[in-house]
């Protein structure tokens, strides 16, 4: 199976299955000399891990990360970093009824036709469980970006089902299980999710991710554009069905006089481009928006077929997120960090000595 690696100079390969003994990631290309320990990685894993509220899957995994290689005396050595997370709460018996059938909306049918074999336990390799090592690797990338360039990456939920969440305060995001930037709307979100669980149904979400403190110049035209690689990475996140950069699809209804971000000596006027022009970072905030579909595993019986092609009904049991978007924020942050780190190293390799007389203007004019 190919397609398990993200990045060129800072590459991450994940491994494992949902109900296997362990999952993990190998980072290749991390610069040497950066202080790194499990304590630098664990906080982001704790933000993503299951069982943290009644609104997510009740699978209980500690998601404790182990650094097996690439670090000596507390510093990265420049050699591959292997991160391991052991699975401890598998309940494979919950999937006995789907061995011979295909769950609607899942990868069961496509994996079976492509490989002629599939691991039905928790979705195997296609499970969102495999986002844990992505978050672990992303924490390493976040640390390097922060220390080397002052780049910070933060995300939040802007919509849960039909409920739009007005942005009020970044400080509210870590204080609730929805990663919502608005404490006033939490009771409505709680009530909404409680009713959804009672109905045995699921719902989608919209996630926003922002990178601040960006320098100018990261990105490679034409087919390795920074925005293209961001979209590529984000579409690798389970359940993502749409990615917007900056104004995104709203650009369709804008006029050029509105959409084009003017430049002044004092800074940019607007950021409809989402911090990227011609596939290269402008020095403004990079803004990304993700559309996440409803969880496919629901208790409502659904029509499907079995391996013989005969009609059947599938009712999913087990422990599942009624909205996978609730835990998606730290994953999206990690993916953005991985792409930015890769492009930072690529820029340094080819254009690190380039200097121009034109000053870099402020990301936002006063």
Swiss-Prot record:
GO annotations of cellular component type: cytosol
Entry-linked Gene3D superfamilies: Chorismate synthase AroC
GO MF: chorismate synthase activity; FMN binding
Segment forming the signal sequence: none
Cofactor: FMNH2
Residues that, per the record, bind FMN: 125-127, 238-239, 278, 293-297, 319
Keywords in alphabetical order: Amino-acid biosynthesis, Aromatic amino acid biosynthesis, FAD, Flavoprotein, FMN, Lyase, NADP
Cofactor stoichiometry and binding remark: Reduced FMN (FMNH(2)).
HAMAP family assigned to the protein according to its UniProt record, in alphabetical order: Chorismate_synth
Self-association state and partner proteins as the record states: Homotetramer.
Protein name: Chorismate synthase
